[in-house]
Amino acid sequence: AIYSQLGQDVGVSVEPCRRDTFPAIVLSVAYLKDVLGVAEDEPIVICPVDPYVETAYFQALQALCDRAGESGANLVLMGIEPTYPSEKYGYIIPETADDLSRVTMFREKPTKEAAEEYIAKGALWNGGVFAFRLGYVLKRAHELIDFTAEDQL
């Protein structure tokens, strides 16, 4: 879907086998740094590629990328306004109701009752769209992954 919307010149990293989100991101970030020479202060956006989206989505991705580069935040998330209390999504609880806000709490796939409470507090669904500076994820990867242990690679 991404090539049909953006053309063949866009760079896409595909994980060689399923190892969950963080290892896939680390693989992509390592490729960007080691193969393409991307600087560690460069903002990177992570997003699902399966949905068909409108042009406004890409404008929002650019704003997210800009915010990651300018704000000094380690991670910038894009939330989705919930339409019902779901146990299938993570919830982002923002500090304020502004379009841009610090996150006070994040809860992954809560019970329906907890989701109702979060929505009442102005929570947003985590849509899996976020941005960060490349160096931040490299630093976290080296803190969390033992790159000398074969079973972790």
Model-derived segments and spans:
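Conserved N-terminal catalytic core of the sugar/cofactor nucleotidyltransferase
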Residues: 1-46, 52-59
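Short coil/turn connectors at secondary-structure junctions
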Residues: 8-9, 40-42, 70-75, 87-88, ...
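A short acidic, often aromatic-flanked loop/helix-cap motif at beta-alpha or helix-coil junctions
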Residues: 18-23, 83-86, 112-113
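Short acidic, glycine/serine/threonine-rich loops at helix termini
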Residues: 40, 56-59, 87-91, 142-143
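Short beta-strand segments
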Residues: 45-48, 77-81, 107, 131
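Conserved donor-nucleotide/metal-binding helix-loop-beta segment in metal-dependent transferases, i.e.
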Residues: 52-87
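Catalytic core of tubulin tyrosine ligase-like
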Residues: 91-153
